[in-house]
Amino acid sequence: MNKVFDKLKPVFEAIAANKYISAIRDGFIACMPIIIFSSIFMMVAYVPNAWGFYWPDNVTNTLMVAYNYSMGLLALFVAGTTAKNLTDSKNLELPKTNQINPVAVIVASEISFVILSILPLKTGVDLTYMGTQGLICAYIVGLIVPNIYYVCIKNNVTIKLPEQVPGNIAQSFKDLIPMGLSVTAFWLFGVGFKAATGTVLPRWIIQVLSPLFQASDSYLGLALIAGAMAFFWFCGVQGPSIVQPAVVPIMIANTAANLQQYQAGQHVSHVLAMNTMDYVMNFGGTGATLVVPFIMLFAARSAQLKAVGKAAFVPCTFGVNEPVLFGMPIIMNPMLFIPFLATPIVNVCLFKFFVSVLGMNSMMYTMPWTVPGPIGILISTGFAPLAFVFVLLTLVLDVAIYFPFIRVYDSTLLAEEKAKEEVIEDDGMAVLASDTVSPSIPTGLTVATATDDDATHVLPETAPSAHGEAYFKQNEVDVLVLCAGGGTSGILANALNKLSKERGLKLSAAARAYGQDMDLIKDMNMVILAPQMESMKGNLKKITDKYGVKLVTTTGRQYIELTNNGDMALDFVESNL
């Protein structure tokens, strides 16, 4: 089985690292604060309805102003952020002295999107497709405009002014031709498209893709989405980074439609909403692993699983399940393949049954993915009475699915630990080795530097410090830790910052989700890339090489140990400077 996954992994990594998929994913992530912020006003306006309290109409309308003019313009913002992220990738292919202006690209993309999306009315304009219903069109615009700029800048199709002209003025004229070409191209396309179809592009896209929207809400569609995320992760590639860009427009549109149904007093019926992925499919992280650390904590007999359970139950509660994925491990572990794939599928099909058959309201609010799954389900469904039953039943089913497989795996590890102890005792060594037994996880780390090209060095896990703490007391060192969602990277950065403060060191660490790091990298001395983002190493190395920053990657087990041991994390940084 592992040989098959080893062959598939490079293909999945190439998909995840594709610059266009990355631009869509990172462009959406950049707009998440808008979605969460606007949802706060929406929840204040409508969550009290669950307890029979209704605001006066003027209060509700006032609260919804913030929602309507943030989420109502989401596609406009996404067009800009998607274009910006693709521009950053394109700039890596250009000389440092001849770069695309990201601000100009954002402006051109947003103008082009508005031209394609607004429907003129007799009095005013229709802004329907500036929000969630225009997301696919926004992605299209955000991916095309940077390429127009790239062709113009690369081939010097720009207006050049004398050297005596100030740089900011010269840049404005340099951007004139690519901006003019971009806006004019979309204007001509919009005019021709409307003449041919009688409607604007976003509306036409929704009409054409409506069967796909409906299919994604079916049992089969939901199972494929949930299973695909788990399958990719099992192969070692961050699943949501591949699946999410394809389904985000559907999830956001469904969430908005659900809210409209609720406001109209109708049954909230769309199953695939934003938080369905976060709280149902990924109940405690990809693979629905919320119950896994608790099973290990209370039922495991092997030292390895007991230790992982102890370290993982808090992060998993908040949807950060890397300690489980890499600590057990689940990734590439045939013993845990079936429950890891089956549990999220069972969860989402059960959710579909509760919504479609039992009449429970689906999710109409968008909460941060780090909210514990049971709490997030209750809030997102507006505290629907059946949601309480669903949460309890989901917990029971997840335990029932995972428990027998974990028990078998635990027995295997326990036997290995006992065998190891016997060997040590036979050699006359009074050392208990069970805590360090990890036959399926290699140790060591890989370091890629700006002078290293594609070569890598494998260092021992306990590499000696190159400088000692005295170095950090005399020199400022900035470290950036990157992971998929900012969860484990935050834990590691906090551990480094805490020790730095306690010992008076000039070491500063920052944490980001991958894709939110471009502006920080140039000011860093080191970037630590979490193992779940290994597929992005090639793209990231181009950026770190550009700024002469050291890029360091770790194995899964070592990364988890670093997040749980501040001294080890500090030694790790020291040994790589």
UniProtKB/Swiss-Prot annotation:
Keyword tags: Cell membrane, Kinase, Membrane, Phosphoprotein, Phosphotransferase system, Sugar transport, Transferase, Transmembrane, Transmembrane helix, Transport
Task: Enumerate the active-site residues.
Answer: 483 (phosphocysteine intermediate)
PTS EIIC type-3 domain segment(s): 4-405
Q: What induces it?
A: By lactose. The operon consists of lacABCDFEGX. A second transcript of only lacF and lacE is also lactose-induced.
Q: Which residues carry this modification: Phosphocysteine?
A: 483
What NCBIfam families is this protein classified in? lac_pts_IIC (TIGR00394), lacE (TIGR00410), pts-lac (TIGR00853)
State the name under which the record lists this protein. PTS system lactose-specific EIICB component
Give the source species: Lacticaseibacillus casei (Lactobacillus casei)
